[in-house]
């Protein structure tokens, strides 16, 4: 994905939150709640100083490995164009991030971690003071644009760990 300083950081952060960043996200609801394939299925962005990486996944039973990969790829496709983010999802993601933001500063360790990110990424001293305002500026149209521009099915990589003899036949069909 994008580097940490990219202007699309805030929309992509919000998009990830509703895609797989919390228990009411699309990935979690599909693979845990609807299908029962996993106890937890999430996505996260590993922000780096250069291009970053969006990861999605979770532990699943061997016999539903293929189906889990299919559903994950479907969710990527859906959020990009098949089933765009709704106003309700947008508002829930925004509110969830806002409500959870203070919990990033509850302990000394968390405070040190957040302050070290300022130095690591070369962020301004007022970054955290402006974080909520920057997220408030994100629109639903921004999420649609970022999903269409930043999630590219052609660049997705699939990594599966498990009993190769059991899972490879199903995965080779994809």
What are these regions (language model features)?
Residues 1-3, 15, 29-81, 87-140, ...:
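M16 family metallopeptidases and their MPP-like homologs
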Residues 23, 64, 166-167:
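Short phosphate-engaging motifs
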Residues 6-19, 26-29:
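Active/ligand-binding-proximal structured segments within catalytic/core domains
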Residues 7-10, 23, 71, 89:
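Short acidic-hydrophobic sequence patches enriched in Asp/Glu that either
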Residues 7-14, 151, 166, 170:
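PPIase-associated folding chaperone regions across multiple families
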């Amino acid at each position: 994905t994008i580097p940490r300083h990219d202007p699309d950081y805030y929309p992509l952060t919000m998009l990830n939150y509703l895609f797989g960043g919390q228990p009411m996200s699309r990935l979690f609801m599909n693979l845990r709640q609807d299908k029962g394939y996993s106890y937890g299925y999430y996505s996260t962005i590993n922000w780096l100083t250069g291009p970053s990486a969006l990861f999605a996944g979770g532990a699943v039973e061997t016999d539903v490995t293929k189906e889990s990969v299919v559903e994950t790829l479907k969710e990527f496709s859906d959020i990009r164009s098949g089933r765009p983010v709704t106003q309700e999802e947008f508002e829930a993601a925004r509110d969830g991030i806002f409500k959870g933001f203070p919990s990033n500063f509850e302990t000394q360790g968390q405070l040190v971690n957040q302050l070290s990110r300022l130095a690591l990424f070369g962020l301004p001293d007022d970054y955290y003071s402006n974080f909520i305002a920057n997220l408030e500026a994100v629109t639903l149209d921004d999420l649609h644009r970022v999903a269409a521009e930043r999630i590219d099915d052609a660049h997705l990589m699939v990594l599966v760990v498990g009993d190769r003899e059991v899972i490879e036949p199903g995965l080779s069909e994809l």
